[in-house]
């Protein structure tokens, strides 16, 4: 089974867009002479571009996930996966790349995820708004 799904980080995008707007308002109130605001705007735009979405792919013999245009790409062999299950994260784990009590979490929005445990014992979670679809794709492709 081939699977590809991209989740947009809608709330994250809104928060970053509001932060960019705030920086521009501050710069405007300072007569557009606020280099710190410009630096912050550039940084926020880069973060928005890199972390605005999370794509997950299951194809052939691999599970892949990456943020935005291919940032922080991770690839795992399906034969290395021992178990996979649908989970719900605590809101406290947040978005982005986080170390949690359950291993690394890669997430852009929401609380739903699929937890993967490798034969090596390593565990990680991939946040998704399609946990059933991802779980089905992984489960059907594990040798």
Q: What is the predicted role of each segment?
A:
Residues 1-31, 105-106, 111-113, 123, ...:
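N-terminal membrane-targeting/pre-transmembrane regions
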